[in-house]
Amino acid sequence: VIGGAKCNINEHRSIVLLYSSRLFGHTLINKEWVL
């Protein structure tokens, strides 16, 4: 995680922001996890 900040585990559970480029890919594992 680049530029992340700590927060309570129950805060913002559904917010995900992805910056995509041709060098990286993202996979949605389930409704709570992005790899």
Swiss-Prot record:
Q: What is its main location?
A: secreted
Q: Which domain of life is it from?
A: Eukaryota
What keywords are assigned to this protein?
Blood coagulation cascade activating toxin, Hemostasis impairing toxin, Hydrolase, Platelet aggregation activating toxin, Protease, Secreted, Serine protease, Toxin
Tell me what controls its activity. Inhibited by diisopropylfluorophosphate (DFP).
User: What species does this protein belong to?
Assistant: Cerastes vipera
The keyword Secreted belongs to this UniProt entry's keyword annotation = yes
Question: What name does the UniProt record give this protein?
Answer: Thrombin-like enzyme cerastobin
Tissue specificity note = Expressed by the venom gland.
Where found in the cell?
A: Secreted
Record-listed E.C. numbers: 3.4.21.-
What is the relationship between temperature and activity?
Optimum temperature is 45 degrees Celsius.
* Subunit and partners: Monomer.
Gene Ontology BP annotations: proteolysis
An annotated GO cellular component: extracellular region
- Tell me how activity varies with pH: Optimum pH is 7.9.
